[in-house]
């Protein structure tokens, strides 16, 4: 909400279209909800077209990747589908969003290139018992981010990893 308070146009991804109106009402006209699942390349591509149209030649200042899930339990009880869902959401989903939105982050139409912020967690650097799926996906996200950071140096696009410690959010419900 700080970006909105400073007058920036904020695009926020949501999976449930029914949340569009309440979020728009809560955050105001500078909040544009985008309905897509980060694991669905086609949905993200449609959102990209909407953002590109709204920006009308301007660049996207920041891409924040924050999609996540946390299904906890011992490895012997986690299904391969649950493990796969962690990787698809946090790693492949981030890859999808970066790849699709990257053209809007370049400095072609603006004096300064955009930034990519990938939200990790303490689980991205330290494995925890009963969190193998979550920690594995966060480790992979950090590896992807480090590689991307070096790859995008030539374009002066900064890649930032933020790894907050645990705090109460809906992911733990």
Annotate each PLM feature.
Residues 98, 137:
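Active-site helix of classical SDR
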Residues 154-173:
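SDR active-site lid
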Residues 74-75, 79-84:
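Substrate-binding pocket helix/loop in short-chain dehydrogenase/reductase
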Residues 76, 124-133:
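Active-site loop immediately N-terminal to the catalytic Tyr-X3-Lys motif
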Residues 121:
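Residue(s) in the substrate-gating loop at a strand-loop-helix junction
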Residues 36-49, 80:
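The beta1-alpha1 cofactor-binding region of Rossmann-like NAD(H)/NADP(H)-dependent oxidoreductases
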Residues 1-11:
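Canonical Rossmann dinucleotide-binding motif of NAD(H)/NADP(H)-dependent dehydrogenases/reductases
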């Amino acid at each position: 909400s700080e970006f909105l308070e400073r007058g920036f146009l904020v695009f926020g991804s949501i999976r449930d279209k029914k949340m569009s109106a309440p979020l728009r009402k809560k955050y105001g006209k500078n909040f544009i909800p985008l309905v897509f699942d980060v694991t669905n390349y086609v949905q993200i591509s449609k959102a990209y077209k909407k953002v590109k149209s709204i920006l009308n030649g301007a660049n996207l200042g920041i891409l924040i990747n924050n999609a996540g899930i946390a299904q906890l339990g011992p490895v012997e009880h986690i299904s391969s589908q649950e493990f796969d869902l962690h990787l698809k959401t946090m790693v492949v989903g981030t890859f999808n969003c970066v790849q699709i939105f990257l053209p809007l982050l370049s400095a072609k139409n603006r004096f300064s290139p955009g930034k990519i912020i990938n939200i990790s967690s303490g689980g991205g650097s330290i494995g925890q018992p009963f969190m193998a799926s979550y920690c594995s996906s966060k480790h992979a996200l950090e590896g992807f981010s480090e590689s991307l950071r070096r790859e995008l140096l030539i374009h002066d696009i900064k890649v930032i990893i933020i790894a907050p410690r645990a705090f109460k959010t809906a992911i733990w419900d």
